Amino acid sequence: MRPPCPQLFGFSHSGPSLAIYGRATHPWSRLAALPAVGLMVLASMACHKQPPPPRPYVAFVVNNQSQSVVAVNLAGPQIVATIPVAPLPEEAIQRPGHREVYVVSMSGKISVIEFPELTVAHIIDIGKQAGDLVFSPDGDRAYALEPQTGRIVFLDCNSLKETGQVSLVPNLAHMAITPDGKTLIASDPGSDRLFFVSTSTQKVLGTVKVGKTPGPLAVLRDSSVVFVADTGDEKISAAEISSHTILAHIEMGSRPNGLALKPDGGELFVFSNEGTSMTIVDAFHDNIEQVLPTGRDPVAAAFSPDSSMMYLATAADGFVSAFDITNRTVQSTLHVGVSPVALALTPDEHFLAVADSASGSLALVRTSPLSLITVVPVGSNPVDVIVPGWELGQKGL
């Protein structure tokens, strides 16, 4: 058996975890002149591959009560900008193919932040409220849900003008767009229906009855099937998009309140705030594959691009867990704060940015091994975080 590498350095601190990065300065030409102890140190350093430091990706953190978005340089990590936005911001979404972040506020407005300027360039007025916001695949068009009145507002993202709207029914819950960009789907908890709307004609294509109190939605990559969490029942429903018909009702055992679809579309993860487990559904055959334990109140998930790993935040116990999807195992669990409610994986997959609504902070977490690097205070009630593939000092997309 190969002996373990010796531990070279140790560091403990009563406050937030710290990361110190450095490099050896001895030229290899002087290797023969080093004493035996120096050779042991170099050998151990070679054995221990140092993990890479964070790159200067920018995390955009949405502070609901501070009415701001904080831009954090993860290489610091340090705050590089505090950006005032419309009141009661809830969500940040990157516009596809552009260096813009759209911030949706419950006050009925959308603030458009430009990078690298890190300023609000435009504010779009949607109505009394602004709910879910989705983009066309090319990022040229956006569709905003105004839940209270039940309207879908069509936007041209280049001119920032409204190009139309569709009125459905008041108090809609959620909205999704098919990956091909052709169909919008909205869930109506009042009538237990889904609405299907054409993005080209701006007309209602049809509806379908699902389970009780439909909520969050997830759409397969081929735009064929939509899954909806029936939050008033202990089940989810699957509907065919082209025919607007029900394919299956899948019993869960508890009321679902969240859905997360793997990037490859093969499996759907169903979460419930009533328990401490998640249900894995075969998205192609509509059957339950497995139930895995989680912490209390799973609220946010992030996948690796190859669909091999999932990172899950559980708000009621302050943990982030790493799940090996391939082997169906909990790889590790880490306490990151009081109430983590959102998380984002950096494009290089080495780090997680985790927003904690209770402590008003952003935790920077290394993914391998799962470990806390530091915590940055960001504002009052951070509720969302995204990390686009942009770096400070980088030119072009």
Language-model regions: role of each:
Residues 1-3, 164:
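Accessible peptide chain termini
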Residues 3-35:
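Bacterial N-terminal signal peptides that target proteins for export
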Residues 32-44:
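Bacterial N-terminal signal peptides
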Residues 43-397:
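Predominantly soluble domains enriched in secretory-pathway, periplasmic, or organellar proteins
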